Design a protein with these regions (language model features):
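Conserved short alpha-helical segments that host acidic/polar catalytic motifs at enzyme active sites
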Residues: 134-141, 145-150
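A contiguous strand-loop segment
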Residues: 2-124, 145-148, 152-158, 162-172
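A structural signal for well-ordered alpha-helical segments within the folded catalytic domains
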Residues: 126-127, 140
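Second-shell loop/turn segments in exported
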Residues: 115-118, 128-135
Length: 172
């Protein structure tokens, strides 16, 4: 039997799993994502407090993306890789009980990109976490804020983002 050296060797993609409440025994909803980034880069668990005087602008560390932010910010947790302290928050919850899982890269076909191209200085996946989660009170608000940001700034790449709260689960 010929051994297939490609399976499980060097392949790694972020994968999102969404399970609705009708599929679990107790009605729980599950939203989870694997990570394909280097396992040797440790995570920081960051905790940010609620504030009335937060940053008024987000400035990306690795692109020219910037956007204004509301001064009032909910507290939230984030799990960035240690070398990206202010970006790539990836997953956590805010003090309103909204959870966000972000940084799942999605690739589009060349044909799709002809009709809906990426925007060089648009919103990228590494910027979504700190510009959305601290400012929303429901999962629905999360997907609405993210969608409005994509409409305003365009998207620099393809990505999938999930939001969950006590009542709803959303994936964009």
């Amino acid at each position: 039997m010929k051994k297939n050296n490609k399976v499980g060797h060097g392949l790694s993609e972020c994968t999102t799993i969404v399970v609705g409440g009708k599929l679990t025994g107790d009605g729980s909803r599950i939203f989870a994502r694997s990570e394909d980034f280097d396992a040797m880069r440790c995570k920081n668990w960051l905790v940010f407090d609620d504030t009335e005087n937060g940053p008024e602008e987000f400035v990306a560390d690795d692109s020219s993306f910037r956007c204004p932010l509301p001064k009032k910010r909910l507290g939230y947790t984030a799990l960035p890789d240690y070398q990206y302290h202010h970006e790539w928050g990836s997953a956590g919850f805010n003090t309103a009980g909204v959870g966000e899982s972000s940084t799942e890269t999605i690739f589009s076909s060349p044909e799709a990109l002809k009709h809906d191209p990426y925007v060089e200085n648009g919103l990228a996946e590494n910027c979504t976490y700190n510009t959305v989660l601290p400012y929303v009170h429901t999962a629905r608000e999360g997907v609405e804020r993210l969608g409005a940001m994509i409409e305003k700034y365009g998207s620099a790449e393809g990505f999938g983002i999930g939001f969950i709260d006590d009542n709803e689960t959303w994936y964009l």
